[in-house]
Amino acid sequence: MQQRLPSLLEHPVAFAHRGGKAHAPENTIEAFRLGLKLGATGLESDVWLTSDGVPVLEHDGVVRSRFSRRAIGDLRRNQLPSFIPTLAELIDECGTSYHLSLDLKAPNVGLRVLDVVGEVGPELLPRLWLCEPLWQDLLPLRDHAEGAKLVDSTRLSRIKEGPERRAATLASEGIDAINLHHTDWSGGLVTLFHRFDICAIAWDLQFEHLLRPILRMGIDGVHSDWVDRMMDAYRAELGAPQL
């Protein structure tokens, strides 16, 4: 059996992707509650801004009806379906005893996220992970992060300068983590980013036979739709989950 490599985090994070979309309608309070009930130590979602500046959790950023499609950014909060939760509602309903990873989907949404979390759940800030596909878009958040983690969410094939140069750049620019598809990761690549104190996160891990080897690589976080499978693998490799 592969020897387990060390993680940067004392307790790697098990993120329920969109709340654990295999178990309940994605990005709903029902899904987020269930993901935590099934043992996830983190929740994942996408965050958009309504036209009146409210951060809401939804994947596509589009509200569909029988005859139309409207962008969330063109609608006020009170025009959205009730099943689309606001960030504040997530915190009100689920508390703050978990990690929260958010893909930032709208201009300036990161600053509003930090404002809302600071207002309604400041104890969540050290466990808040803010993700962008262009790491440069995270730079305006550095002076406002209040302990939140900034995450370069990309693919290995897009890192044209090579992973070592990217790791060095992220470290020098104050970015905390990199999030790659699980097929991009190897034990050596995890170790490389750890040398620069960059956390290594993996996504799209739907089966135990994929989860267990990547946890042994020393990965710092995993994302899965199937929370039960993820937690079975986590306990088998790392023991009881903790924050």
Language model features with spans:
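Phosphate-group recognition and catalysis centered on beta-loop-alpha active-site segments
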Residues: M1-L243
